[in-house]
Amino acid sequence: RDLRYFHPNVRPDTHNRLLQECDEAFRRSNEIFVQHFRTKYTSEPYPPLWMMAEVMTYGQLFTMYRQLRNQEQKAIARSIGLQAPVLESWLHTLNYIRNAVAHHARLWNRQIPVRPMMPAQRHRPEFYTPLPIANDRMFGVLSLLRYMLSQVAPQSQWPQRLISLLDDYPDIPRLSMDFPEDWRDYSLWTL
């Protein structure tokens, strides 16, 4: 809420509108943790950010990240081994993907118009071994998700579930999604 954490170019009315939307989402929520907060912390006007993030839309989270000062963005990106512009581009791509999925859009053979920036090879060589991962098809998007999950939830079974899904449906046209034949052997997928 404190404008000191946000970029000086963010207009206060824009920032306040975002906060009002987030507050409204929290007020509407019937989640158990929200009910607990309301009953136990009656003197607290606002919930902690981790709690608020649970009820915010992806678009609101993305907007909040974009409004942060560069220093704050860098700290968040660094915590998952990325540079801030790379993380912002990934969040933008994932916002596009999320909206496409919500509207039942076809993605499997689509060229992704909101392309994620790939990290520099010297910072993240796993995106380049054995070959560079392209950023315009679903394999690139799935690869960045794989990387992010390895950083924030290393115990996640999502990579194994994706592999099982593709094994269960061998007729899925992987080439249209830019999956290389040996994708399972790529450094990123063996983390």
Predicted features and spans:
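Long, contiguous internal "core" modules enriched in hydrophobic/ aromatic residues
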Residues: 1-191
